[in-house]
Design a protein with these regions (language model features):
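Flexible, low-complexity linker and terminal segments
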Residues: 24, 29-262
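Active-site/ligand-binding-proximal alpha/beta "capping" segment
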Residues: 7-29
Length: 262
């Protein structure tokens, strides 16, 4: 979400199981075309090591999204404004090899044609145009591709990635506990209303509770408990159920480290 040289828009899509991964790969490519920016398809070790039997019908090819926004072809060779202003942040483009058009590319700030510029007014305009892509994506991407509220509860668990399967199964053993699974991590979805008045818990495969930090930053809602595991082993059902029961019963610390498999 934050890595890279300078600040630029990118989308981060985290798959929760193998079927998600198959479909999300297609979505990531479609979004990269649509928004003309980087899309990170985030997987993890446990998904990569998992085997699963799925019906053939599940592996469907998704219909193409919005047609690529192409620049008009020129009658004779000529430059065109590859980085022209656009209300939604996405400028029309010509694929490489398009007859009659050409443009310049540079890693420095550039004008509408692609020439390097240090003009501060133009710099602001180009930066604001690029970053507008995030808001456009947040508004256009269907909510079901951003997050899924599998069940609501006074204790609301948030997770991403391969914790999905374990936490969905854990719900069968827990009363009053809900699960909100996040798929689009950036731009962060507008989930603050779903968190209102809940005891919030994140369950994650990392040391610090990265999702908890992100949720607090983007929603201004405090995450009350962080359940983390970082020993290279997946979170198991019994671990998840035991720790979430402790949260529900009010006897859990703010940070819970899972160590099964050591």
């Amino acid at each position: 979400i934050r890595g890279g040289h300078g600040e630029y828009p990118r989308l981060v899509l985290a798959s929760g199981d193998l079927l998600d991964a198959f479909l999300d790969a297609q979505k990531a490519l479609a979004w990269a075309w649509r928004y003309q920016t980087v899309v990170v398809h985030l997987l993890d070790k446990f998904l990569a090591s998992t085997g699963q039997v799925l019906p053939k019908e599940a592996f469907r090819v998704l219909p193409p999204g919005e047609e690529k926004r192409l620049a008009p072809k020129a009658g004779k060779p000529a430059p065109y404004a590859r980085y022209a202003p656009a209300k939604d942040g996405v400028s029309p483009f010509a694929p490489l090899g398009t007859q009659g058009v050409f443009y310049w590319m540079t890693s420095d700030e550039h004008d509408f044609l692609g020439h390097i510029t240090e003009d501060p007014v133009l710099r602001e305009a180009q930066m604001e145009k690029r970053m507008q892509k995030l808001q456009t994506a947040r508004e256009e991407i269907p909510k079901e591709d951003q997050y899924t509220l599998y069940r609501d509860g006074e204790v609301l668990v948030l997770g991403f990635g391969s914790v999905k399967g374990t936490l969905l199964e854990a719900l069968d053993h827990l009363e009053g506990v809900g699960y909100l699974h996040l798929r689009l991590l950036w731009p962060f979805p507008e989930i603050a209303p779903l968190l209102e008045g809940k005891t919030l818990v994140t369950v994650e495969h990392n040391y610090s509770g990265q999702l908890a930090d992100l949720v607090q930053q983007e929603t201004l809602k405090r995450v009350h408990h962080r359940v983390v595991k970082y020993n290279g082993r997946p979170i198991t059902l019994d671990e998840a159920v035991a720790r979430l029961k402790a949260v529900k019963e009010g006897r859990a610390p703010k940070r819970l480290v899972l160590r099964k498999g050591v």
